[in-house]
Each structure stands twice: as C-alpha cells, then as structure tokens.
C-alpha cells in the first residue's frame, strides 16, 4: 500500500485495500471497528480484565490493540509455539476473565474442534469466538453450558463490512 490509515500503522494489520483515483493503494483495518461492536453487543467491560487471545495472526493483533486501547489489565496471546502456548495454558486458569478465539479451530467443516477446554477456568466472564460458521461453535457451546456469556463473530463480520463499504465509497 502507498498510504496506510492510523489504525493500520498502530495495529500492523491491513484487511481493506482500496485503489484510489490516482492509482495508489490505501490500506485500512476495519476489523478493529467490527470487534468493538462485538464487545458492545455483549455489553462487556474490558477495563482491568485478564484477557487471553487465542491465535497469533492478523485478527489477534487487532483484538490486542483494541484491548490495550480499552485498558485491559493483562493481555496474553496464546500461540502454538510462543512463550504462552497451549501446553502451559493451565497457568492462566485462575486469572482469565475473557477469552477471544481468533483461530479457525471450530470453523466449518471442522465443527467438532475447539481450541481449548474451558472447564479449568474459574473466573471466566465471557468467550468471544470470531468464527461465525457455524453460529455456535463447540467453544461457544461449552461456554454457554458453563453459564459464561458468549458471542460469535457474525457481528464483527457485518460491522467491519459496513465500514469497508463506507471506506470504498469515500476513497474511490
């Protein structure tokens, strides 16, 4: 891209690219806005909370930036190979308040998969799964059975698409 929005510059992840009238490319990130609407729809307060982000791709960067901006107390990214990984997840069982799944685990057609088992988490208030197909992943289903608030990724998808459409119309 020839020009990047301030969001992209701070997050480091682009998901919307528009070719401008002069032929240059403009990059933006609409997932931040979409994720904010997901939090809003759930009525979730993140300030001071202990947040686990599952996955280390572009979506996780966006979620981390949002959580930092909203004042989350501790933000831990869980990846397959990092310092915080699925093999030592139990060290977060007593602390985590919010889990955000940014991995594809549980997405159609692998609906029998989940990135983790929620049973050990004692202070969990909410599970946000960016997956929207199926509407209720195995992770969401388990959270509901434990009485934990949940939301899938459909709100994020719809809201980021609205913003992307607006950006396309404004920039072209």
Enumerate the language-model features and the residues they cover.
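Rossmann-like adenosine-cofactor binding region
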Residues: 85-151, 155
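Active-site capping/gating segments
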Residues: 37, 149-171
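Short, well-ordered alpha-helices that flank and scaffold nucleotide-derived cofactor binding pockets
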Residues: 37, 41, 65, 69, ...
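Residues in the short beta-alpha loop(s) of Rossmann-like NAD(P)-binding domains
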Residues: 57, 81, 133
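Glycine-rich adenosine-cofactor-binding loop
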Residues: 29-32, 39, 48-68, 72
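Phosphate/diphosphate ligand-binding glycine-rich loop within oxidoreductases
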Residues: 1-41, 146
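NAD(P)-binding Rossmann-fold cofactor-contacting core
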Residues: 69-87
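Short helix-loop-beta connector
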Residues: 44-50, 122-123
């Amino acid at each position: 891209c020839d020009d990047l929005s301030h969001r992209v510059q701070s997050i480091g992840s682009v998901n919307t690219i528009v070719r401008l009238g002069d032929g240059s490319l403009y990059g933006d990130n609409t997932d931040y806005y979409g994720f904010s609407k997901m939090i809003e729809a759930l009525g979730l307060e993140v300030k001071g909370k202990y947040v686990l982000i599952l996955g280390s791709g572009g979506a996780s960067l966006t979620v981390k930036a949002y959580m930092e901006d909203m004042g989350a107390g501790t933000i831990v990214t869980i990846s397959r190979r990092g310092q915080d990984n699925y093999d030592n997840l139990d060290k977060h069982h007593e602390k985590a308040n919010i889990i955000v799944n940014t991995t594809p685990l549980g997405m159609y057609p692998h609906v029998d998969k989940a990135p983790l088992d929620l049973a050990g988490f004692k202070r969990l208030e909410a599970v946000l799964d960016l997956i929207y197909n199926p509407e209720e992943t195995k992770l969401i289903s388990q959270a509901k059975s434990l009485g934990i608030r949940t939301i899938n990724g459909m709100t994020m998808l719809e809201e980021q698409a609205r913003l992307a459409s607006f950006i396309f119309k404004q920039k072209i």
